Amino acid sequence: MTSKESFERLREVEARLKDWSTLEERDALEKEHDQAIRELVPDVGVKCTIVYYSDYRAATITQVLTSHKIAVRFNATNCIDYFGGRYEILPELEGEERIFIKRRNGKWIADGHLSKDGVRLALHYQRHYIDPSF
């Protein structure tokens, strides 16, 4: 499955997730949605989010090293409202590359971090938010 096909499958499942009639059907669709996220195929240029506990950093995939190892860089951002959590995500990349490895559970975790409490990568959306309470 290619990267484009895997993201199309996720969008299809997300569309079906909006129309459910029973709780069992919703649960089955949520499981299918989670599976589609785990099966996403990374590609250079895909927008993603690095999740640091309560903070989110917008990033872009810069290299696919292997099928289970990728490099990402932060996107530049413009702060519109720090305490309101509003940021403009710019296309320019900044900072050094960070390596993420896909674990057996399907999650992308920063190289050298534990699966349980490690820094995660979300391939299915791009968001930037710095928690002002820390």
Give the ranges of each region predicted by the language model.
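Mixed-charge, low-complexity intrinsically disordered regions
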Residues: 1-58, 69, 74-134
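Residue-level recognition of beta-strand termini and adjacent short loop/turns
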Residues: 65-66
